[in-house]
Regions:
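Interfacial helix-loop-helix hairpins and adjacent transmembrane helices
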Residues: 154, 184-187, 213-225
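Non-catalytic alpha-helical coupling and interface elements of nucleotide-dependent molecular machines
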Residues: 20, 36-40, 68, 77, ...
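Extracytoplasmic/periplasmic membrane-proximal domains and adjacent transmembrane bundles
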Residues: 1-70, 79, 150-152
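Hydrophobic transmembrane alpha-helices and their membrane-interface caps
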Residues: 73-159, 165-184, 198, 202, ...
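Structured binding elements
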Residues: 96, 188-193
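Alpha-helical transmembrane segments of integral membrane proteins
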Residues: 65-68, 115-121, 191-194
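Helix-termination/interfacial motifs at the ends of transmembrane alpha-helices
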Residues: 64, 182-190
Length: 225
């Protein structure tokens, strides 16, 4: 060869691969399984995966720190808004409502959990929490105005149905072209769009149907306490 590369005093040979039409993480996982099954490296040789895959692994490691901090920040802001740990915890429950849909969205789109998908989850949680705040804050206001629990829940869901649906619908419709794109960059846009669209479907439905029930249960527990 025209050049012998070394790293840490050892010879190094770089094999480059261009991945097109599928996600990088899934390709590397499949390649690792095939190499482990069919290739036996001689003594003194080792194999490392670098390039974009290494960068993706580093980004995922950072996201594993950022995501818990994001959830804590959301909880803190909710507590500052409502001055109640119970209501903050109640609205935080929309996160699993949204995450369920996001996971199913990745599955049905044939995508894997990647950096774009993780960013999609963070965006999704923000929209889902916003819808939860819109609904619960109005129900809480009705209760303070003297409405009974049943009246507050019925009026709250009825009057906040359109704002919640509009917020979710606009976000979903804006991402539809990204979900069905197939050109360069689609490996980044498709996972993000799949997570947000599917997550908003489940979070919106469960926010309107389940969150009022949980609000009643939380308030009854507070009265008992």
């Amino acid at each position: 060869p025209a050049q012998i590369s070394r790293e840490s005093g050892r010879r190094r040979l770089v094999v480059g691969v261009n991945v097109e039409g599928r996600d990088l993480g899934g390709f590397v996982k499949e390649a690792q399984e095939l190499i482990a099954k069919n290739v036996e490296l001689p003594q003194g040789y080792n194999l490392q995966w670098g390039g974009q895959f290494e960068n993706m692994q580093r980004a995922m490691a950072r996201l594993m720190i950022i995501i818990p901090l994001t959830i804590l920040a959301i909880f803190f802001l909710l507590f500052m808004l409502f001055k109640s740990l119970r209501l903050a915890a109640l609205i935080i429950l929309v996160l699993p409502f949204a995450s369920i849909g996001g996971v199913f969205g990745l599955f049905f789109a044939g995508e894997y959990l990647s950096v774009p998908a993780a960013v999609g989850f963070i965006n999704l949680w923000g929209i889902a929490v916003l819808n939860g705040v819109v609904l619960i804050s109005f129900i809480k206001q009705l209760r303070e105005d003297g409405y009974s629990m049943e009246e507050a829940l019925l009026h709250g869901c009825g009057h906040r149905f359109r704002p919640v649906m509009m917020t979710a619908s606009v976000a979903m419709l804006a991402l539809v072209p990204m979900l069905f794109s197939g050109g360069p960059g689609s490996e980044v846009t498709r996972p993000l769009a799949a997570v947000v669209i599917a997550g908003l479907i489940t979070s919106t439905a469960l926010t309107l149907l389940v969150l009022p029930v949980l609000y009643r249960w939380f308030e009854e527990k507070e009265v008992e306490a």
